[in-house]
């Protein structure tokens, strides 16, 4: 079978080594004669998976000891509700940075539980879309926390600055950039991320929460979303998505074997630079994001003639370059370059783009 490179924004490409290992032990995991999907989540064998996964993740991200690591369900959208209901306490307001589609989605959900103080940070630089630097964010006073999304997958907008807002509790949706580069977890009160981009398959949600923020939950909060309940039960308040957890654990071990997050950062910068350079040097393709805010994970681009979009997608798919269609909100194309996408795949995409431009430009 010809090599296929999956540029989907999620569920995304998984490391080939991880898939091969899962295939090898699918029906006879650790000599038990059963699949890991079939064993109890409270068995000694699966508890070892859970503990090993957490330890590997803590090592990869250098998670401080005063943070809890939770493996949850419901995706990032569940966290849009869980965050205000866990963190507001007696407060009624929180600051929400609006930088794109997913930040706006979090705001819309938060309106059910609090009065979000919306701070629009989008701007333009030389007709290119951009994000204002953090020093220009006009935060309110008295908000329970500040929420933002460091990477907008649809718009290809990234906020690479680390927050430095004193005692302000900072909450961030790292769904699309978690584990793609080193991160100072201590700058945040809560980090959450859906698994289906850089962690593992869909079904698992990662939450990293500072311990002093536990115990503030609304009495109306469902127990399954209560960080304190999940922490007290080691993320097993109910039956977790065990297979997704197991596969995520394999991804963590793969990341460590590759050299950790510093190596991932190096690879991801190389991949993104190659694709952006190809777009910028071409008369046929364009990207409308200012260089300072270009996402390394999600690269949207448009063809000079949108009438060629369908043909581009048809031919790229036939060439083994899958899931390049842009989000329905913005159209065009999008290549997601998560950790498991190799430089070889981006080079194949670039070669195809140049050939397509020569034939149709």
Swiss-Prot record:
Its cofactor is pyridoxal 5'-phosphate. Pfam families: Aminotran_5. The keyword Cytoplasm applies. Pathway: Amino-acid biosynthesis; L-serine biosynthesis; L-serine from 3-phospho-D-glycerate: step 2/3; Cofactor biosynthesis; pyridoxine 5'-phosphate biosynthesis; pyridoxine 5'-phosphate from D-erythrose 4-phosphate: step 3/5. InterPro entries: Aminotrans_V_dom (IPR000192), Aminotrans_V_PyrdxlP_BS (IPR020578), Pser_aminoTfrase (IPR022278), PyrdxlP-dep_Trfase (IPR015424), PyrdxlP-dep_Trfase_major (IPR015421), PyrdxlP-dep_Trfase_small (IPR015422). It is an enzyme of class 2 (transferase). It is found in: Cytoplasm. Keywords: Amino-acid biosynthesis, Aminotransferase, Cytoplasm, Pyridoxal phosphate, Pyridoxine biosynthesis, Serine biosynthesis, Transferase. Pyridoxal 5'-phosphate binds at residues 76-77, 102, 153, 173, 196, 238-239. Its EC number is 2.6.1.52. It catalyses: O-phospho-L-serine + 2-oxoglutarate = 3-phosphooxypyruvate + L-glutamate; 4-(phosphooxy)-L-threonine + 2-oxoglutarate = (R)-3-hydroxy-2-oxo-4-phosphooxybutanoate + L-glutamate. GO terms for molecular function: O-phospho-L-serine:2-oxoglutarate aminotransferase activity; pyridoxal phosphate binding. The keyword Cytoplasm applies. Signal peptide: none annotated. L-glutamate binds at residues 9, 42. One of its GO terms (biological process) is L-serine biosynthetic process. Binds 1 pyridoxal phosphate per subunit. Belongs to the class-V pyridoxal-phosphate-dependent aminotransferase family. SerC subfamily. Homodimer. Catalyzes the reversible conversion of 3-phosphohydroxypyruvate to phosphoserine and of 3-hydroxy-2-oxo-4-phosphonooxybutanoate to phosphohydroxythreonine. This is Phosphoserine aminotransferase.
């Amino acid at each position: 079978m010809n090599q296929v490179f999956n540029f989907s924004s999620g569920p995304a490409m998984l490391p080939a080594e991880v898939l091969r290992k899962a295939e090898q032990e699918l029906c006879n995991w650790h000599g038990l004669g059963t699949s890991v999907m079939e064993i109890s989540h409270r068995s000694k064998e699966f508890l070892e998976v859970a503990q090993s996964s957490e330890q590997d993740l803590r090592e990869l991200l250098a998670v401080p000891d005063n943070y809890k690591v939770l493996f949850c369900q419901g995706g990032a959208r569940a966290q849009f509700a869980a965050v205000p209901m866990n963190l507001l306490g007696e407060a009624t307001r929180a600051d929400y940075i609006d930088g794109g589609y997913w930040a706006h989605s979090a705001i819309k959900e938060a309106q059910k539980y609090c009065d979000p103080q919306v701070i629009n940070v989008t701007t333009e630089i030389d007709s290119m879309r951009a994000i204002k630097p953090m020093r220009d964010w006009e935060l309110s006073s008295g908000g329970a926390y500040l929420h933002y999304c460091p990477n907008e997958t649809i718009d290809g907008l990234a906020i690479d600055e680390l927050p430095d807002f004193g005692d302000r509790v900072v909450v961030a949706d790292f769904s699309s950039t978690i584990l793609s580069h080193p991160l100072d977890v201590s700058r945040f009160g809560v980090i959450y991320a859906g698994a289906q981009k850089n962690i593992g398959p869909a079904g698992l949600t990662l939450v990293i929460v500072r311990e002093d923020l536990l115990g503030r939950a609304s009495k109306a909060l469902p127990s399954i979303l209560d960080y304190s309940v999940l922490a007290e039960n080691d993320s097993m308040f109910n039956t977790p998505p065990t297979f997704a957890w197991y596969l995520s654990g394999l991804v963590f071990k793969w990341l460590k074997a590759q050299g950790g997050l510093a190596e991932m950062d190096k690879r991801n910068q190389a991949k993104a630079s190659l694709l952006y350079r190809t777009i910028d040097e071409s008369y046929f393709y364009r990207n409308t994001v200012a260089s300072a805010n270009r996402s390394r994970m999600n690269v949207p681009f448009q063809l000079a003639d949108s009438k060629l979009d369908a043909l581009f997608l048809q031919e790229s798919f036939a060439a083994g370059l899958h899931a390049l269609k842009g989000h329905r909100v913005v159209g065009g194309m999008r290549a997601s370059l998560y950790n498991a996408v190799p430089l070889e795949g981006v080079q194949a995409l670039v070669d195809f783009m140049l050939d397509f431009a020569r034939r149709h430009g």
